[in-house]
Amino acid sequence: NLTPEMVVDKVAELTLYRDDILVQRVNGIVRRFTQGDTGHHHTFYSLTLVPALERLSLRHNSRIFQLNTVPEILSILLQEMGINDYAFALTRDCAQREFCVQYRETDLDFLHRLAAEEGLVYSFIHEEGKHTLIFSDASDSLPKLGEPIPYNTLAGGMIESPYISALS
């Protein structure tokens, strides 16, 4: 008897196990939730899990920031939407902007624009109960895969190692 009010905009976590060993954890907030078919002893539900950063796509703004660096402006945007799990891993100092305008764009679009102008990228670190947004100006600081994952589009058969079969 789950309702959307109980689930939407709440923290959720997807844990992936292989041979009873935790191999990955994905933490986020529920953006979409639907109830599917109900059977004799079960009900199917579907949900969309997104990073908390997606909250910034829900608000449009027009405003001016004065005498702030891009990390300071990004911090303001995140804190306004209740996002406190973030960090900056920068190799250089960002210049203070005398004047910075957000005009009729979502907070997320504004964040993306400022990050691109400053040469910043972001990634997420998923831990139990939270995900942390990390801004960086150096690609070598981004998380790396332990080993390559093969891409296999052929259906059927049994492959002993993990692989990617489709991208969307």
Predicted regions and their residues:
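Amphipathic alpha-helical and helix-coil boundary elements used as assembly
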Residues: N1-S168
